[in-house]
């Protein structure tokens, strides 16, 4: 077997049972990975220097094809209502078949870290059969110093073979696509999908499983911090496509990370060393920091259409998918944190993409309301972020990231509530979805409005304004905010048909109530009293 690059020879591919490989390219950096990806016709060059790849039929995650090995160690630890399972024997067969499929192939390996805090990080080795996948995951996770590679010993191993086709009868899955995690062996197998996001979310899922036991709260959120001497941080929870990356990229604040973080007794820390930003309808004027990364060597653009002659990206072209993305190292953002760490948050923002158009652009939550809305995780699945999703769909994704949370939501909710109370954190619910009507009749909340409201929340001025109680949801909504039209703050005033608004709001409240029934036995009376209808009746 030929080896190219630097690695710990005492812990090579044989340690995971990968044998008879044609070659392994170890820890290659961007220039070499560009060469390999272009030589293999895996990708193209865009004007400006980014590498552009397409992912075929899988242009988003495949959550229904994700499985956890159900064994003695996980039986009572995993939330099986939300996680598919396979047996240890089925996983063993799958792993053997992955090994057989890899024989004779050239693979690319990256030795990386998940977690900027050395006390709470995982050493993740990622094997891929595509060179551009290797660059993608190198961009997204944290890269060790080259001098440390010779002593690197992996804790978690990911094997990503898009050309592998699973056999449902043999492997216990439902299709030819499979994402299987064995927490006991610390192995992840990804087959039948070239969507690169599966790799990063597998690391996230692993950390979401192991960290709560150490008292660390893993979070599907972005984070930034003020540039002044206080350095106070803010967290932005939200499902993919709700604005986490866009809103945390603020030139007036330091970016900690755009998607995955931990909150320990020492503060917050990024799980990653890069960003994975949506690029559909990306604008140089509206999102200059992200736009600039698409014109840099080293960035990977996924399913972005480029002109066949000029190689200029067309960010308005959704012919491949709405879920177009770019992946780049965190240091491509000028104001990004060099450490990926910050102190305890002063503010938490829960982003919801309200597909009904009845929620206000911002609301202040009590501790109990924050717990309620965190467990509810109301949002809309935005087109393209999952396979087969072509239009926004109202949903409840508990913890604002149900597909990645292997444990019961109450584990994460209780940790969050405890940390919020301990550090006196203000919590805000922000609607980046629709206003003036639902999907098809209303319009998306203007980003300038969201940015203005967030600025007021983060600098402390919003907490000082007059608030009213929302008649449907019970939370506190600002009456006036300088620089924002008063009408926008009151959703009913943006609808021409007030009766239709009332009917729609009532329907959404009913959805909240039905969804939360599964959590009622896991929360106290204060959280149950934060239920929208209960709050409205009490008013």
UniProtKB/Swiss-Prot annotation:
Binds 1 Mn(2+) ion per subunit. It catalyses: oxaloacetate + ATP = phosphoenolpyruvate + ADP + CO2. Mn(2+) binds at residues 201, 220, 259. Its EC number is 4.1.1.49. ATP binds at residues 201, 220, 238-246, 287, 325, 450. Keywords: ATP-binding, Cytoplasm, Decarboxylase, Gluconeogenesis, Lyase, Manganese, Metal-binding, Nucleotide-binding. GO terms for molecular function: ATP binding; metal ion binding; phosphoenolpyruvate carboxykinase (ATP) activity. One of its GO terms (cellular component) is cytosol. Pathway: Carbohydrate biosynthesis; gluconeogenesis. It comes from the Bacteria. Substrate binds at residues 61, 195, 201, 325. Its cofactor is Mn(2+). Its main location: cytoplasm. GO terms for biological process: gluconeogenesis. It is found in: Cytoplasm. Involved in the gluconeogenesis. Catalyzes the conversion of oxaloacetate (OAA) to phosphoenolpyruvate (PEP) through direct phosphoryl transfer between the nucleoside triphosphate and OAA. Belongs to the phosphoenolpyruvate carboxykinase (ATP) family. This is Phosphoenolpyruvate carboxykinase (ATP). It comes from Methylorubrum extorquens (strain PA1).
């Amino acid at each position: 077997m030929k080896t190219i690059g630097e690695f710990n020879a005492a812990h090579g591919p044989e340690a995971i049972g990968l044998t008879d490989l044609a070659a392994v390219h170890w820890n290659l950096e961007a220039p070499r990975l560009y060469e390999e990806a272009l030589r293999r016709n895996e990708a193209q060059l865009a004007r400006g220097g980014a590498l552009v790849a397409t992912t075929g039929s899988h242009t988003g995650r495949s959550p229904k094809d994700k499985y956890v090995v159900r064994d003695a160690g996980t039986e009572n630890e995993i939330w099986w209502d939300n996680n598919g399972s396979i047996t240890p024997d089925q996983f063993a067969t799958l792993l053997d078949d992955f090994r057989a499929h890899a024989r004779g192939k050239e693979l690319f390996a990256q030795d990386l870290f998940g977690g900027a805090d050395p006390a709470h990080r995982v050493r993740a080795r990622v094997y891929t059969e595509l060179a551009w996948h290797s660059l993608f995951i190198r961009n997204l996770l944290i890269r060790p110093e080259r001098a440390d590679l010779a002593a690197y010993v992996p804790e978690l191993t990911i094997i990503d073979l898009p050309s592998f086709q699973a056999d449902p009868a043999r492997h216990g899955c439902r299709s030819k696509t499979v994402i299987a995690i064995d927490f006991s062996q610390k192995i992840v197998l990804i087959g039948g999908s070239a969507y690169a996001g599966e790799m990063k979310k597998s690391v996230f899922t692993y950390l979401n499983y192991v960290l709560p036991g150490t008292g660390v709260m893993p979070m599907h959120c972005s984070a930034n911090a003020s540039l002044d001497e206080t350095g106070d941080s803010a967290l932005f929870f939200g499902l993919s496509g709700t604005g986490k990356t866009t809103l945390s990229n603020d030139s007036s604040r330091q970016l900690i990370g755009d998607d995955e973080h931990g909150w320990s007794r020492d503060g917050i820390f990024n799980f990653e060393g890069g960003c994975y930003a949506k690029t559909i309808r990306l604008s140089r004027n509206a999102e200059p920091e992200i736009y600039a990364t698409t014109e840099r060597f080293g960035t990977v653009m996924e399913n972005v259409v480029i002109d066949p002659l000029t190689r200029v990206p067309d960010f308005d072209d959704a012919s491949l998918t709405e879920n177009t993305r770019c992946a780049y190292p965190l240091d491509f953002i000028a104001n990004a944190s060099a450490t990926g760490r910050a102190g305890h948050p002063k503010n938490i923002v829960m982003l919801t993409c309200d597909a009904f158009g009845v929620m206000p652009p911002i609301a202040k939550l009590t501790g109990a309301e924050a717990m309620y809305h965190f467990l509810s995780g109301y949002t809309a699945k935005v087109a393209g972020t999952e396979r087969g999703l072509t239009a926004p769909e109202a949903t409840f994704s508990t913890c604002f990231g149900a597909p990645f949370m292997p444990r019961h939501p109450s584990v994460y909710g209780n940790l969050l509530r405890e940390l919020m109370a301990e550090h006196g954190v203000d919590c805000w619910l922000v609607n980046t979805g629709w206003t003036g009507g639902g999907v098809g009749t209303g319009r998306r909340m203007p980003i300038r409005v969201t940015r203005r409201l967030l600025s007021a929340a983060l600098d402390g001025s919003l907490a000082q304004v007059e608030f009213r109680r929302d008649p449907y949801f019970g939370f506190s909504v600002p009456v006036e905010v300088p620089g924002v039209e008063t009408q926008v703050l009151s959703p009913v005033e943006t609808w021409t048909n007030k009766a239709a608004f009332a009917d729609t709001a009532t329907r959404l409240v009913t959805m909240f109530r039905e969804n939360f029934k599964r959590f009622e036995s896991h929360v106290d009376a204060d959280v149950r009293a934060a239920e929208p209808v209960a709050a409205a009746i009490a008013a």
